[in-house]
Amino acid sequence: MKRILLFLATNLAVVLVLSVVLNIVYAVTGMQPGSLSGLLVMAAVFGFGGAFISLLMSKSMALRSVGGVVIDTPRNEMEHWLLETVRRQANQAGIGMPTVAIYDAPDMNAFATGAKRDDSLVAVSTGLLHNMTRDEAEAVLAHEVSHIANGDMVTMTLMQGVVNTFVIFLSRFIANIVASRDSEEGEGSNMMVYFGVSMVLELVFGFLASFITMWYSRHREFHADAGAAQLVGKHKMIAALERLKMGQESHLEGSMMAFGITGKRSLSELMMTHPPLEKRIAALRNM
């Protein structure tokens, strides 16, 4: 879970920075914001640029945000088991060996991130290692490996790029209409209105668009559960989810939340990056 909210937050920050740059480009080049074709091209460049920059930064940012410690050489039997389990599952799934890390947190969680199937990260909380059985922890790891094998990070980035493009385009299109009505106040005032309205609308539309990315995240969780069931058996995956029902709420934030094993509770399922555990368990039982 930690993975998705961090990805979304990073993406939003990058898009806002790029939006400021886009306004500077307009000012320096004299390009008219009202040019629909030019605006659409610029929105796509900056929209996809923000998403892919977030993806490329995801491993380092994820490790830094949780204080993760990469396991290069196992220091104990638990770390040795963790490395060998991830290695075995990666071979089964046909992906390169991910970087494996442990981070200190009381909740039972794990997440995967990374720009490529052969250059990814799997991080596990100490709470998961201390409170789950080996079979349950193995299922959680298989879930994260399945996220990587399914290419969920890249497809999420592509979806976010499309969403960003429309957010930037619609925000600036509407801002141009609003600013045009105040053109009698002078060109300087006109640009300030355009800049202010476009930034506010990007925040509003970005929030509304997050419902789309959260829906996609929930959809991919079912696929990752199914992939884990193929790797280790559905009974282990069901046991892991049953254990999570008794555990604490996730402490993961940002983009990592979407690719964790579980997420935060919410009053509405629409605001959740993960489906309710009951639905995930039912889906596995019906396989």
UniProtKB/Swiss-Prot annotation:
The keyword Hydrolase applies. It comes from the Bacteria. Its cofactor is Zn(2+). The active site is at 144. GO terms for biological process: proteolysis. Keywords: Cell inner membrane, Cell membrane, Hydrolase, Membrane, Metal-binding, Metalloprotease, Protease, Stress response, Transmembrane, Transmembrane helix, Zinc. Pfam families: Peptidase_M48. Its EC number is 3.4.24.-. It is found in: Cell inner membrane. One of its GO terms (molecular function) is zinc ion binding. The keyword Kinase does not apply. It is a multi-pass membrane protein. One of its GO terms (cellular component) is plasma membrane. Zn(2+) binds at residues 143, 147, 221. The chain crosses the membrane at residues 4-24, 36-56, 158-178, 192-212. Binds 1 zinc ion per subunit. CDD domains: M48B_HtpX_like (cd07335). HAMAP family: Pept_M48_protease_HtpX (MF_00188). Belongs to the peptidase M48B family. This is Protease HtpX.
